[in-house]
Amino acid sequence: MVQYRVPREELPYDSANRKSIVEYAQKLVGRTLRDSCDVDSFSSKKGNKGKLGQAIEYCYFEYEPNSAQEPDFPEVGLELKTNPVKRKKDKTLSAKERLVLTMIDYCALVHETWESSTVLSKMGDMLLITFLHEPEKDEFDYEFEFVGTPSIPPEDMAVIRDDWETIVAKVKAGLAHEISGGDTNYLEACTKGASAKTVRKQPYSDIMAKQRAFALKSSYMTAFYDKNICLESIMRRRGEESMGLEDLVKARIGEYVGATNIELGDRFGLNPRSKSFNALLTKAMLGVGQENEIAEFSKAGITVRTIRLEQNGRIREHISFPAFEFADLLAETEWEDSEFGKVCNSKFLFVVFKKNELGVYELRGCEFWSMPAEMVDAAEATWKETRRVVERGVEFIQGMPYCKDGYPTIENNLPGSDYNRIAHVRPHASQRAYRFADGSVVGNVARDASELPDGRAMTKQSFWLDKGVVEKLLKDRGY
């Protein structure tokens, strides 16, 4: 039962009128919470200014925050949700976090149907309030970017339903402790609690499972916010309307199995020597234009990588992810909301080429894969260790051999490929670059280096997935 701080007739909106609530909420756009209402009462009462969502409820809508399952505005069935966004270097917006919908009760979940599910009711009618996260500002000074009642398209809701059924099936199989964000596409079961060690009982196993909540993935929310992304869905042919995404992609790419990269380049008018060849080829095989992004992949945060197998099934290089800035890495405090965490908790699509007897790479197929829970934990350990080393100060260790630039080799104590054989850190630049404590410089620091907290700089780094993980996966799947 909602408890209002003032008599209902004194509220600045009509709590029994949906239009009145939405119009009142939309007055926040372009303003801050401090501009819009008295926030002092909340800060002194709650003693915690980190809960902006609760402050919106308490100060702006003037009701007591609660954890009840009923809608926040029960008279009209409207659910209030807040979500932070961040502005990227290209000025576009991306979701900083997933949009949490509701906590998961494993024991109750197995008795729900999709139509009666708690998560469907939470998505039924949402009032979404989005604010721009700027870490240098007080939370009450964040500007509100979007306020509205978004509707989820039917084609997306079909994917979300499949995701929900995937999660329920895992709980019914007694595998709630093995749930991973990579199991699903748009809807995920993310860890939720004081720490990842917060656990709950599950109905069909004695193994305690991490406490989780249903949430729309940050990749899905980014596709909603960033209207500059040109999304194009994979066209379905007659009879493919009910085909799942993975089966659809495998069928499309399967049409070209046996063709070499050179033949495929000729077929689609692509240059195999171009850096963008692999990405453009995947789009071409799926019938998506070169200038557009694959809608289903963008919304699901699917990471696509082209894998080149040698004749013996080995891969020459580890699998890289985008380079990171050390300042951005340290600004990430929660694993699941970190850039690397989002990747590890989403699906991968490996497009597989294998060298034939003529020494030419030919397409063998594609494989979807998500990291098992224990691998996600190992990747998290790498992320945490990297942050720890950077915070304490990266050690530069000079070696004996000299490089082409005339300076000795320089090792460091970031977690390398032998750290846990799952994920590691290594350079992500074609040329090395350093700035030392005495101000001396090696290489092009502005282009190839990232600044450390102590003012030194070192070659840009990125997280890498160990090639042995992918080699074993593909071997087990018959490549």
Predicted segment positions?
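Nucleic-acid endonuclease domains
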Residues: 1-479
